[in-house]
């Protein structure tokens, strides 16, 4: 992948860009259009994505997706996606329910639907120990 460490890409139009395996560590991606960008295995550690558009792209779920500077809009978007997981573990449901008001501020909630609390007592995993 491309070595874009500490690159100034603020405001760049990277719509649909192939950034797979790119090293974007410490890069300035503020207000960048990353809609539809391929961020698989991209290293975003320390990158600044405040104000960036990540719609229809992907968030790296490895160490390269940790410690990324984001704005509330992106945090809400990630929270909404977390809350849409199909997991019946009571600990997950408690965590999910705790952040619902935040997650429902998602900018696409009108088209995706407002999330409602799940009753832990009625969840299929109720009564089971976590991780079993």
What residues fall within each predicted segment?
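Intrinsic low-complexity/IDR segments
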Residues: 1-6, 10, 15, 25, ...
